[in-house]
UniProtKB/Swiss-Prot annotation:
Signal peptide: none annotated. This is Imidazole glycerol phosphate synthase subunit HisF. Pathway: Amino-acid biosynthesis; L-histidine biosynthesis; L-histidine from 5-phospho-alpha-D-ribose 1-diphosphate: step 5/9. The active site is at 11, 130. Gene3D superfamilies: Aldolase class I.
Amino acid sequence: MLAKRIIPCLDVKDGQVVKGVQFRNHEIIGDIVPLAQRYAEEGADELVFYDITASSDGRVVDKSWVARVAEVIDIPFCVAGGIKTAEDAAKILEFGADKVSINSPALANPELITELADKFGVQCIVVGIDSYFDKDTGKYQVYQFTGDEERTKATKWETKDWVQEVQKRGAGEIVLNMMNQDGVRNGYDLEQLNMVREVCYVPLIASGGAGEMVHFADAYKKTNVDGALAASVFHKQIINIGELKDYLAEQDVEVRR
């Protein structure tokens, strides 16, 4: 059995790490590099960095901090933010990132997924999906430009259908960002994760809702996700990654030690 991954998420805006609730009202958490170092030292398996306004601003992620992060940590990390071309992705990988993640650009140009997978290998290509449960329709809908409150909008895609589409096009991994749960710390949306897991045959990462250690255990044991991503519980030192791994091991969850 492959070990389950614990992945701190660092949302980056104007060169600093920020955190919001349900993708809104972001507060500044701190500088990128010291946080990355701290998580690597605590035992994180991987880090994910989202430049949350890059796509909505029409620019590519700022690569200067990518190089600085690569110099100080020895665990894999993934970078997302406005990557629209193979050239954009190549530069980020050259600066030291192990993976690139695309979200809004993939919705605008689904062929980009295939182009990147063919050029760099599927193991480098992550597709992030921002999924929102619409109580009026009773459906999970994919959203775009979620880093900008004024531009964020629903797309034509239902979540399950988009998951299947991105896999066909070459996504090597999917991060499911459950918008309703984001930052509220009352647990991952297990029902949604199980729905997606049924059709997802690539590694699936849960994102949005972690507040207690048991929430990680529930995601791993009840939905069989490959990794769990969290932000505020790590940023605010509510949960220590080393202690979380000890707890998960006690719950018979295979983790890297």
